[in-house]
Amino acid sequence: MGQLISFFGEIPTILQEALNIALIAVSIIATIKGVVNVWKSGLIQLLMFVMLAGRSCSVQIGHHLELEHIILNSSSILPFTPTLCKLNKTYFLVRGPFQAHWGVDLAIGSTTVAVENATKTYTLKSKNFTGCFEGNPDPDSAALLVTWLFNSLHHDYKNDPSILCERVSGENSFRFQINISEPEYCEKILSRMANLFGSFENYCLNNRHIKKLIIIRNLTWSQQCHENHMSAMQLITSNIHTQVVRARRILSFFTWSLSDAVGNDMPGGYCLEKWMLIASQLKCFGNTAVAKCNLNHDSEFCDMLRLFDFNRKAIETLQNKTRSQLNIAINAINSLISDNLLMKNRVKELMDIPFCNYTKFWYVNHTKLNHHSLPRCWLVKNGSYLNESEFRNDWLLESDHLISEILSREYEERQGRTPLSLVDVCFWSTLFYTASIFLHLIRIPTHRHIVGEGCPKPHRLRADSTCACGLYKQKRRPLKWVRSN
């Protein structure tokens, strides 16, 4: 009795504390709801836009998903092959192999420098350049470079106009003169030069000069222009067709041995080292992203990774600058490059369509799980990279694919940790529960009642309205089926 009286005496205190709890709960709910309403009103978004306008362009696709990019260091891809560049619409340069200190220039004009049948002038009717490089300190490399160049221009020694070769005495220099005055031959040569060096003005349409010539001379290389790795790749793929069958496929022997920056095996992914990138120390991609390169050969990024890996090994072995070793390297590199992709991108450039320059690549990154999509090329148009909004559909679709891959991987991992018997038990128990719901809705009757009377339980009536114990003796009374509550 005393405890009951004490309880009633403490009720005001309990109510006061309960009221405090209610006030706190109401305050929290009101604050959260107020913040949500302010966010939905757009005021915060407006302030963020005003503060970040012109300062930030980060693209956040969704929750934990962001659009990021890497820029590959193209200068370290092919140091042992000839590299090409363009100064202007009529002047082009080609650097010798193995980062040579010499090269050749190609100048389009109308000035004649070599005359047929003159002293020290040779007419080339085959690929025999004997006499053109007398006195040159490295005649084999010079002959190889000129051979590659003429092969890339698709010059036919039998049917096309003859090429004149002149050796300048006392200067260890040489000159080649190509007459492109014939319209068809001019279009052919300049179109091939456009494939090699990139787009430039069509000199064949210049009617001010009847005679049109291309002069090729050797020179000392002093970094006159920035070498284009895409042009070097084009030079390689255009020369391989002279050695193997034209229809070919990328070799499938090149499978990824995933490693870290030091070269140790790392099953977790593949890392791009510092020398491969610009403005970044190290970038790693997971197995799922990089392993796609083993399945499909339709990615510019995969081509670049193959070249990086090949370059890392080739520098150690290709120290002897011989023609045979260089041809072996060219064959091996060509088996790693997709010439279809390369040609498509060059054609797109010539047609002023956004194309890939094999330098900048974008990918979708899941910041929480650190999963990446396979990088895709950031296209270029009119000398500048496209804005993110111009290929919005591409990275949104890539983000959907990345989320699907993450969910699929999590599902497979979860399946691997879950016993199959437990899955069966869960399935059949769920099926049983679903069936029981339908049985409950049907409301199956459980016993008989005599119409107009109460429940006869525990007696169980027969079909003739009697029971076994004799309490219900009258037969053939009306019955009905009833469900127990």
From Swiss-Prot:
InterPro entries from the UniProt entry: Arena_glycoprot, Arena_glycoprot_zinc-bd
Binding residues annotated for Zn(2+) 1, in chain numbering: 57, 459, 467, 469
GO terms (BP aspect): fusion of virus membrane with host endosome membrane; receptor-mediated endocytosis of virus by host cell; virion attachment to host cell
Side of membrane Extracellular, spans: 2-17, 59-424
SS bond list: 85-225, 271-284, 293-302, 356-377
Transmembrane stretches, start-end: 18-33, 425-445
Topological domains annotated Cytoplasmic: 34-58, 446-485
GO CC annotation terms, alphabetical: host cell endoplasmic reticulum membrane; host cell Golgi membrane; host cell plasma membrane; membrane; viral envelope; virion membrane
Protein name (record): Pre-glycoprotein polyprotein GP complex
The organism of origin for this protein: Tamiami mammarenavirus (isolate Rat/United States/W 10777/1964)
